[in-house]
Amino acid sequence: MRIISRQIVLLFSGFWGLAMGAFPSSVQIGGLFIRNTDQEYTAFRLAIFLHNTSPNASEAPFNLVPHVDNIETANSFAVTNAFCSQYSRGVFAIFGLYDKRSVHTLTSFCSALHISLITPSFPTEGESQFVLQLRPSLRGALLSLLDHYEWNCFVFLYDTDRGYSILQAIMEKAGQNGWHVSAICVENFNDVSYRQLLEELDRRQEKKFVIDCEIERLQNILEQIVSVGKHVKGYHYIIANLGFKDISLERFIHGGANVTGFQLVDFNTPMVIKLMDRWKKLDQREYPGSETPPKYTSALTYDGVLVMAETFRSLRRQKIDISRRGNAGDCLANPAAPWGQGIDMERTLKQVRIQGLTGNVQFDHYGRRVNYTMDVFELKSTGPRKVGYWNDMDKLVLIQDVPTLGNDTAAIENRTVVVTTIMESPYVMYKKNHEMFEGNDKYEGYCVDLASEIAKHIGIKYKIAIVPDGKYGARDADTKIWNGMVGELVYGKAEIAIAPLTITLVREEVIDFSKPFMSLGISIMIKKPQKSKPGVFSFLDPLAYEIWMCIVFAYIGVSVVLFLVSRFSPYEWHTEEPEDGKEGPSDQPPNEFGIFNSLWFSLGAFMQQGCDISPRSLSGRIVGGVWWFFTLIIISSYTANLAAFLTVERMVSPIESAEDLAKQTEIAYGTLDSGSTKEFFRRSKIAVYEKMWTYMRSAEPSVFTRTTAEGVARVRKSKGKFAFLLESTMNEYIEQRKPCDTMKVGGNLDSKGYGVATPKGSSLRTPVNLAVLKLSEAGVLDKLKNKWWYDKGECGPKDSGSKDKTSALSLSNVAGVFYILVGGLGLAMLVALIEFCYKSRAEAKRMKLTFSEAIRNKARLSITGSVGENGRVLTPDCPKAVHTGTAIRQSSGLAVIASDLP
């Protein structure tokens, strides 16, 4: 039965072939592919495969047989060889791609030999009879978009890979409308040249750009725009390309810049959806490029095969015999021998009208696409979104842009947000047993708790991601590329940064910050100095040495004045009873305030001790009164300060401020290599900070550290020869951690704050900001700081980190007092010995004794109080004899003494 059925089919096919003429069952077509067109070649193969395997009930099938040449180097010689190879194989049409180096060679051969070229490459300039342009022109759509935005001053970046058609159209329109267009060819630019150009344009306040480049160069330009931070709000880019969805714009989504472009392929049409299902099933090893969705050039390639297939069907229906093409031919013959049916092929190609992946495929008599529609897309927070369309009839038509704030919020709630942070104690740390946990549970710290609180208020799921390079975020001065957490946000790798990230102007230009969740400033960390040992005479410290000198001079001065007034005042002179054997009063009335007694009186008053003598005269008592008042105040002040000085241990710090650091060279100082502290010194215009920056920048070895932990370790190991400049909050935290050997000195150098960062234009900005404000007003932020700074501190209570600490007195505190006591006692013994010897010598002369005998008699008397050898009582020499007598009566200037001596 199967044999009979097969014979019937063959018989039917034979009759159909006779009816349709001698049309071949296998149609030879050519394929020319240049470098970096793997995906286009995959689309070419897939289209041919689907055509050859798809049943057609209405017409007899025919197979497309491709002859493909891949040209690695698209020069004239390689293109000529490939084209001649195709021509010699008897192809009826060639599908091929070209660039600016091969376009003229291909079009010349096609015109000379009447071989039609179907191409998805850029449209050629001028008229090419045998070239069918699958790619629509962007001129009309781009000019309509510029009119809509009312741009009259912008930058046009282009290369010559696609010719000058768009440049010519824009410059003509600029001349008509008075536009100011800066046209710049970027064909020979490298990464550095792009960045320099963008920086220069930014200095000129250029914010609007039209970019007309092929996909590879376009992607490179966009990467450089991101690297210099020009993808933020305020910038607008129009991409003169038909594959808006083919471009990687993830980083621009978070940046906030407005990006507009055109999309030729509508991925929502049934035909495209069906092809995509088949595309995803392709083996990536056999079909390179199938791992990504087809680009618009691949869609044009697919449509090109459909156009060729439809052309051959039309030729067969018209009973045009193309079989006389032959299997050989000399493409270099002189004169050229064109293909006879080439005109019919070219005419039929231009008459084709089909629905392909790129919409309506139709050509004019010049072989250019007509009656096509392209969509206009803009980049939104959720990705590319259609905002309108353009066609020849309606021109630019914009559709209503429905607000999608709610949709954006819902999209955030339905996915996991990446939170970038940095390993920095006490903000983010690994738990002790973190190996037992997964995800966010591995971490603990201030920022971990803060992220949890913010997520609760916003209602999102999040994933903590540690920044790979371990940096906060700074822009390289040469490459203009951001690193650290700022780079993670700028380049779209994270959506929130919750870390000790300082709010600065340069960062605010590329990312958004919430209200500060912590206030701080730059501070100085040094190694805690050893406690100073009190000096022997530390009891003198309560008063300055100048005051002590003044007290000594005051003491001497008061004693001299007291001596003088006592001498001149008659009331200080009084009469004494006469000595033995004398009658009447003494010729020299006594005065108690000699110079030595005056000194003794002043010293006793100063020491707040009593004295056997006191002034009798009014003038002397005035001197004594003011001296007592003086000593009262001085002694009270001294006593008040003495308690504090003797019971407080002091640590002498070699550095107390930034000025101290700047004016010395013995102690080195530095900051983090990448962060706001370094940026503060680099940009500062204050003389002290400029001097510090000059030193830090030129210091060898480098004083910049990669991490805070490295800086702290350097402080601890430097034996007081290195100071680390860091945020005050981190300084205070480390001061509370063992081994408790660092300390903060001086005040903060500036005032700033830490904020939660989001990419520019992110829908998370407002919810995050409100969450931080709520946490601040509820006191949660203060509780978190106390928890991680002081409650978990290892160096005692919060106030124990002060520089002075009260303690019990030690012997060293009062050693000087004991020294003075011992010294005074020793001095007294020495003076007593001198007096003993002096009086013994005088006694020896008076008693006609030898000095040794006088010494022995004095010693015997001093020890035993015994009588000497001659029966004389040896008594210590006294200035006056003591007598017992009646009361003294003085009358008329005479003294009468009654004595009871026999």
Curated annotation (Swiss-Prot):
InterPro entries: ANF_lig-bd_rcpt, Glu/Gly-bd, Iono_Glu_rcpt_met, Ionotropic_Glu_rcpt, Iontro_rcpt_C, Peripla_BP_I. Keywords: Cell membrane, Cell projection, Disease variant, Disulfide bond, Glycoprotein, Intellectual disability, Ion channel, Ion transport, Ligand-gated ion channel, Lipoprotein, Membrane, Palmitate, Phosphoprotein, Postsynaptic cell membrane, Receptor, Signal, Synapse, Transmembrane, Transmembrane helix, Transport. Residues 593-608, 609-611 dip into the membrane without crossing it. The lineage of its organism: Eukaryota, Metazoa, Chordata, Craniata, Vertebrata. Ionotropic glutamate receptor that functions as a ligand-gated cation channel, gated by L-glutamate and glutamatergic agonists such as alpha-amino-3-hydroxy-5-methyl-4-isoxazolepropionic acid (AMPA), quisqualic acid, and kainic acid. L-glutamate acts as an excitatory neurotransmitter at many synapses in the central nervous system and plays an important role in fast excitatory synaptic transmission. This is Glutamate receptor 4. It comes from Homo sapiens (Human). Glycans are attached at residues 52, 56, 258, 371, 407, 414. Disulfide bonds join 84-331, 740-795. It is found in: Cell membrane; Postsynaptic cell membrane; Cell projection, Dendrite. Homotetramer or heterotetramer of pore-forming glutamate receptor subunits. Tetramers may be formed by the dimerization of dimers. Interacts with EPB41L1 via its C-terminus. Isoform 3 interacts with PICK1. Found in a complex with GRIA1, GRIA2, GRIA3, CNIH2, CNIH3, CACNG2, CACNG3, CACNG4, CACNG5, CACNG7 and CACNG8. Interacts with CACNG5 and PRKCG. Found in a complex with GRIA1, GRIA2, GRIA3, DLG4, CACNG8 and CNIH2.
